[in-house]
Amino acid sequence: MDFGHRLNFPTNHPLNLTDSDMIQKADLILSLDVRDLYGPLVKLDRITRKTVYITRKDCKIIDIGFADINISKWSQDFMQLQEIDLHIAADTLVAIPQLTVMCEEALNKNGKKREDIRSRFDEHKRTHEALRAGWQEEVKKNWKGEPISLPRLAHEIWQVIKNEDWVLSCNTLEDWTLGLWDFDKAYRHPGKSLGTSTQIGMSTGVALAHRGTGRLVVDIQPDGDLMFDPGTLWIGAHDQIPMLVVMYNNRAYYNDWEHQIRMAEQRGTDEKLAYLGMEINNPPPDFATIAKGMGCYGEGPITDGDKVGPALKRAIEYIKKEGKPAVVDTVTQFR
């Protein structure tokens, strides 16, 4: 299971069970370079901020990595400390091959155990395939929705870029890209995005790192994030940093809007007022025009999923010819 802080495991591998219930079922969890181990093991109530463990009471935890000796230049008094049964301070690049050899030696001494593992592999493969099939079904459910549904947008981007040597910079479109795309190389994704006003800058940095490699860097760009620093587009144009910017434009600071809805429910106040200070509408920013004003390619806004693919192809053609960012403003549903 990959928690997405960097790309650790191919998404299409039959043993990738991310988003399954394996944590709830496991009798042993091996953690590899997981800084916040507590988070994946609990369920969070977003109103009360209370957590409840989802793991079995008899589940053992082994942690391999350097998290315990991590030093921050400012502070390290954050995140919940997770109790573990065994911690091994080691570089996982060194430890995993050695652990693999040890497992092979143990299996060579016990043929029955190897058969059990093969049977378990087949079971996990079926679970993986069912997960992927379920996500594909979600794409079809709201295929014609306007604005564009997130699964549909992830699908449309994938159909255009899958034959390119691509890199996804930060935002994963609420993880729909991880469920629908084939992340098959470590450089495909440096890790999940951070908070608002960071993503356009991080994406530009990723694009700069890959400049000259022939790779197509894709930034799925939230509208609220770009509102904080649209001038970054000018940097991309000025310094000729090629990047495909596909807007995740739900015309809202919806993460906070959603939180205000939850708080209204808790406090018994009017949920209809949750939009105050949260909508990016009336009027909606014209991101295509903003992009053009910064010296980039701009197209949109697009609310029809059928028009996304052709627009992306035009943008990619511009990127390959001019070597500068291209912005396609796709308007999406909130979630």
Question: Where do the model's predicted regions map?
Answer:
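Structural motif
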Residues: 28-30, 166-167, 216-218
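A short, charged, Gly/Pro-tolerant segment at domain boundaries
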Residues: 120-130, 330-335
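Hydrophobic alpha-helical scaffolding
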Residues: 16, 82, 86-89, 114, ...
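Glycine-rich, acidic loop regions that bind phosphate or pyrophosphate groups
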Residues: 2-124, 312
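Active-site diphosphate/adenylate-binding microenvironment
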Residues: 125-211
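Thiamine diphosphate
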Residues: 14, 20-25, 96, 176-334
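Anionic group-transfer/hydrolysis microenvironments
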Residues: 4, 33-35, 65-67, 87, ...
